[in-house]
From Swiss-Prot:
Organism expressing this protein natively: Dictyoglomus thermophilum (strain ATCC 35947 / DSM 3960 / H-6-12)
Name used for this protein in its record: UDP-N-acetylmuramate--L-alanine ligase
EC number in record: 6.3.2.8
Cellular component terms per the entry's GO annotation: cytoplasm
GO BP annotations, alphabetical order: cell division; cell wall organization; peptidoglycan biosynthetic process; regulation of cell shape
């Protein structure tokens, strides 16, 4: 796969990087990595014999054959600079994943939202059908004990990252497109460029491959007529190949009948709530059908699925019967889906939201404000930059002002950091509330701080 046996990952604690490092270690490479932080992923890598360095230094890469980086690594990173000066081959994360997708029949999940959950569901369906897939997922999946697994079977299941166009490097045998939405506009500029990228990815699917599309997404419907000479199936709530009907939604999950072209296949029960998760499961059922897998084993896999870390994840109960949840959602569509789902609990909804990136806040502050209006109380933290440089005039106040203007009755507060957020939460919580920490940054620490002060061992209806 790679020239040389010694591979070093700069920024190894990241979800995508740690998964690739794990796969490389499992394949027998001598792997090392560095990061400014350690987490559960680096602990797991250490158990596999991976050398983990805290912080960055040229000394870490003196004897390596290849250096792997992601888009999050700045060009002035000292290890990156040293690797260039010594002509050590530097590989982008997406190039390494692309190499892996050449080795097996690869099922690539792309789209603005739902990639991690959809990839996880598909992975578990393949696992339950004993195909022993290789799995690379963008979150912690309890069922495989992490975010990656090297299998001996013919399939690989992985997420494709469209944020910087690198999904175009991958080699899908089957491509799943969960949706196309206005995101990463700093890279794409407009929705038409995003649609064009997905059409180009679809073109990469081989003659004997397949495309699986969410027909409920308008932007996908816009491009479907432009797909040429590809075998494709659709899923959605109506007018699609795979559909769901007779739906029962509650806070502990859902039940529904699944149909293929109006022929009932069976009834499905999910332990993860929300209409969006029904859609995610339909894509997994679609993959099962395409690959000719056993339907009963597929349903059993979906019924066992407890979710992915930081996706509507139940964290615990604190005093006065307050439920604490955490979610990764940071785009308006994701925020809306999460809040609609948690509304099923019929509790007052207190949301601590941390905007993610200055560019996303600049482009989508109005839409974020609209999505947050489903809350009863909003506590707005400052923007989590994710390495971006500040944009003059762009801050959380943009969202705050939009909410004040359009939803003056909504209780909303601006805070600066984790400590202020936790303090404000304690002052506004009432008996029986539901507290949600929301965002792709470190907002989850607010919930953890409160739980550390008084977590109760109480059973609730939805436990993941």
């Amino acid at each position: 796969m790679l020239n040389g046996k010694r591979i070093h990952f700069i920024g190894v604690a990241g979800t995508g990087m740690s998964a690739l490092a794990y796969i490389c270690a499992e394949k027998g490479y001598e792997v090392s990595g560095s990061d400014i932080q350690e987490n559960i992923s680096t602990i797991r890598l250490k158990s596999k014999g991976v050398k983990i360095y805290r912080g960055h230094s040229p000394e870490h890469i003196n004897d390596v054959d290849v250096v792997v980086v992601s888009s999050a690594i700045p060009p002035d990173n000292e290890e990156y600079v040293y690797a260039k000066s010594k002509n050590i081959p530097i590989l982008h994360r997406s190039d390494l994943l692309a190499e892996l997708t050449k080795e097996k029949k690869s099922i690539i999940v792309g789209g603005a939202h739902g990639k991690t959950t959809t990839t996880s569901m598909i992975a578990l369906v393949l696992e339950n059908n004993k195909t022993d897939p290789t799995i690379i997922v963008g979150g912690e999946l309890e069922d495989i004990g992490g975010n990656a697994k090297l299998g001996s079977g013919e399939y690989l299941v992985a997420e494709g990252d469209e944020s910087d166009g690198s999904i175009l490097k991958l080699n899908p045998y089957i491509l799943v497109v969960t949706n196309i939405d206005n995101d990463h506009l700093d890279y794409y500029e407009n929705i038409e460029n995003i649609k064009s990228t997905f059409l180009k990815v679809i073109e990469k699917v081989p003659e004997d491959g397949y495309v699986l599309l969410n027909l409920d997404c308008k932007n996908i419907r816009d491009i479907i007529g432009k797909i040429k000479d590809k075998k494709y199936y659709t899923y959605g709530f109506s007018n699609a190949d795979f559909t769901a009907d007779n739906i029962v939604l509650n806070s502990s999950g859902s039940e529904f009948d699944v149909y293929f072209r109006n022929v009932k296949l069976g009834r499905v029960k999910l332990k993860v709530p929300g209409r969006h998760n029904i859609l995610n499961s339909l894509s997994a059922i679609g993959i099962s059908y395409i690959l000719g897998l056993d339907f009963e084993q597929t349903i059993k896999a979906l019924e066992k699925f407890h979710g992915v870390q930081r996706r509507i994840q139940f964290k615990g109960v604190i005093e006065n019967d307050v439920l604490v949840f955490d979610d990764y959602g940071h785009h308006p569509t994701e925020i809306l889906a999460t809040l609609e789902t948690l509304r099923l609990y019929n509790r007052r909804l207190v949301v601590v939201f941390q905007p993610h990136r200055y560019t996303r806040t600049y482009f989508l502050s109005k839409e974020i404000a609209d999505a947050l209006s489903l809350s009863d109380v909003v506590i707005l933290m400052e923007i989590y930059s994710a390495g971006e440089k500040p944009i003059p005039g762009v801050s959380s106040r943009n969202i705050y002002d939009e909410i004040k203007k359009k939803y003056p009755e909504l209780e909303i507060y601006l805070v600066n950091d984790i400590v202020e957020a936790a303090t404000k939460v304690k002052s506004v919580l009432r008996d029986g509330d539901l507290l949600l920490t929301l965002g792709a940054g470190n907002v989850w620490k607010v919930g953890e701080a409160l739980l550390a002060q008084g977590k109760k061992d109480v059973n609730v209806e939805y436990s993941q």
